[in-house]
């Protein structure tokens, strides 16, 4: 258990409106359904309260923003400091002409659906990404031939002091699964599409959904794509070549359907999953000479002592 931060935070920010919770289990918040607790969770109701929170937070207290929990592994020792969760105002979508404004907590698939209803093309690829707009901006999320960089007009976010910043696509410095902007909590993005037949868009989204269901372990306890594709190669092919398809450690397994996915078959600890991923990396390096880079974000502390689940 962590020490209770709430009294300290309340003293430092008496006008805070957002909810504070202490020692919050995070396993239910993540798609892997495992991992330790958060020392403190702050639910930000809006940008103004988030800015106030950041502006009055002790700089020695660490922060981490948690969205849908789809591309993250929380280690078994939990996350020290404050985990920030977005409240309702960050879920808003506003459509004006060919542009769509979306809050950081908007699910990628919801933005894709809103664009389809408005007859705006360019967003269908988001149907294949299990995350939120904030996370998509952070890692230049992409799938099925599209990336967030392709549709971004501008975005904004807060720094650690609570100051608001605006960014153009050029200032974001996008590259493969990466943006160059650091130390910013993205709060909103403005995106642009083009007029397209809504039925055509829905048809494209349906094909993406079918392809995901056929080739990926959807509706399982997984964190999505585990490793980034190396230059000129596909991670899953290298993993398969190294003989890792179906490899297990405790209740953690390399998916037999798509071997760039790790799955929790029931009672896997976060350590089981991370250690299995490291085993895969070692085997791929030995077999192919390629060192795979984690795409899943691993955060938090390992436990003091750990026994592999049986």
From Swiss-Prot:
The active site is at 177, 225 (proton donor), 295. Belongs to the MurB family. This is UDP-N-acetylenolpyruvoylglucosamine reductase. The gene is murB. Residues 34-211 form the FAD-binding PCMH-type domain. InterPro entries: FAD-bd_PCMH, FAD-bd_PCMH-like_sf, FAD-bd_PCMH_sub1, FAD-bd_PCMH_sub2, MurB, MurB_C, MurB_C_sf, Oxid_FAD_bind_N. The keyword Cell cycle applies. PROSITE patterns: FAD_PCMH (PS51387). It comes from Beijerinckia indica subsp. indica (strain ATCC 9039 / DSM 1715 / NCIMB 8712).
């Amino acid at each position: 258990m962590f020490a209770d931060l709430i009294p300290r935070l309340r003293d430092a920010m008496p006008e805070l409106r957002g909810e504070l919770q202490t020692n919050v289990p995070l396993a239910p918040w993540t798609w892997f359904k495992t991992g330790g607790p958060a020392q403190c969770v702050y639910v930000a109701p809006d940008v103004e309260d988030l800015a106030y929170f950041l502006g009055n937070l002790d700089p020695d207290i660490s922060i981490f923003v948690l969205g849908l929990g789809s591309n993250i592994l929380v280690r078994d020792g939990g996350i020290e400091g404050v985990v920030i969760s977005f409240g309702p105002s960050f879920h808003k979508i506003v459509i004006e002409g060919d542009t769509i404004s979306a809050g950081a907590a908007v699910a990628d698939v919801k933005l894709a659906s809103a664009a389809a209803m408005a007859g705006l093309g360019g967003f269908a690829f988001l149907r294949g990404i299990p995350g939120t707009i904030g996370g998509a901006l952070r890692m230049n999320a992409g799938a099925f031939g599209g990336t967030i960089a392709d549709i971004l007009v501008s975005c904004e976010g807060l720094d650690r002091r609570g100051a608001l910043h605006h960014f153009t696509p050029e200032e974001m410095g996008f590259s493969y699964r990466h943006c160059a902007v650091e130390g910013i909590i993205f709060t909103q993005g403005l995106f642009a599409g083009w007029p397209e037949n809504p039925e055509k868009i829905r048809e494209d989204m349906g094909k993406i959904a079918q392809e995901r269901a056929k080739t990926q372990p959807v509706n399982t306890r997984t964190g999505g794509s585990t490793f980034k594709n190396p230059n000129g190669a596909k991670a899953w092919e290298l993993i398969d070549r190294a003989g890792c398809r179906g490899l297990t450690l405790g209740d953690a397994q390399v998916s037999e359907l798509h071997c760039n996915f790790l799955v929790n078959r029931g009672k896997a600890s976060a350590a089981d999953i991370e250690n299995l991923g490291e085993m895969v990396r070692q085997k791929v390096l030995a077999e192919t000479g390629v060192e795979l880079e984690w795409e899943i974000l691993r955060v938090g502390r390992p436990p003091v002592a750990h026994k592999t689940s049986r």
